[in-house]
Amino acid sequence: MLGAALRRCAVAATTWAGPRGLLHSSRTPGPAAAIQSVRCYSHGSHETDEEFDARWVTYFNKPDIDAWELRKGINTLVTYDLVPEPKIIDAALRACRRLNDFASTVRILEAVKDKAGPHKEIYPYVIQELRPTLNELGISTPEELGLDKV
């Protein structure tokens, strides 16, 4: 279906209206018209929860991580259909601190609260697990900053 739509678009882009309002092809359709539908299946091995956690902790613990990589990692992590483990969030908060990026720390904590959704017990658990790190790094939660009332 997508291939047919792309072929129609490619043909439409190469036609023009003649004197009687008829469409005339100025050239033959290009390679975009030859697109065929392809089925992509994942035949690779699946990543375990421990491997997933280790990958993200390693990513945020890179000593040379810059602000762009930090935001890219946070954005990618937020797109997953899960609430990150506290050890991943801990590594991300420490990366924010190394870069002196306080705004990203608040954004991470707000994203965790949002990802928890209707499960009200998840966010307090994560904050409880992160409390030593938050105190060590001098990071306030969005609730402590009054951002939950805005």
From Swiss-Prot:
Modified residues (N6-acetyllysine): 87, 113
Transit peptide: 1-41
Record keyword Acetylation present: yes
A single cellular component GO annotation: respiratory chain complex IV
Protein's name according to its UniProt entry: Cytochrome c oxidase subunit 5A, mitochondrial
Pfam families xrefs: COX5A (PF02284)
Quaternary assembly: Component of the cytochrome c oxidase (complex IV, CIV), a multisubunit enzyme composed of 14 subunits. The complex is composed of a catalytic core of 3 subunits MT-CO1, MT-CO2 and MT-CO3, encoded in the mitochondrial DNA, and 11 supernumerary subunits COX4I, COX5A, COX5B, COX6A, COX6B, COX6C, COX7A, COX7B, COX7C, COX8 and NDUFA4, which are encoded in the nuclear genome.
GO biological process: mitochondrial electron transport, cytochrome c to oxygen
Organism: Colobus guereza
PTM field: In response to mitochondrial stress, the precursor protein is ubiquitinated by the SIFI complex in the cytoplasm before mitochondrial import, leading to its degradation. Within the SIFI complex, UBR4 initiates ubiquitin chain that are further elongated or branched by KCMF1.
Motif SIFI-degron, residue numbers: 2-17
The entry's keywords: Acetylation, Heme, Iron, Membrane, Metal-binding, Mitochondrion, Mitochondrion inner membrane, Phosphoprotein, Transit peptide, Ubl conjugation
Domain of life from the UniProt record: Eukaryota
Family the entry assigns: Belongs to the cytochrome c oxidase subunit 5A family.
Positions where Phosphothreonine occurs in the chain: 141
Molecular function (Gene Ontology), one example: metal ion binding
Record's bilayer topology term: Peripheral membrane protein
InterPro entries named in the record: Cyt_c_oxidase_su5A/6 (IPR003204), Cyt_c_oxidase_su5A/6_sf (IPR036545)
Pathway listed: Energy metabolism; oxidative phosphorylation
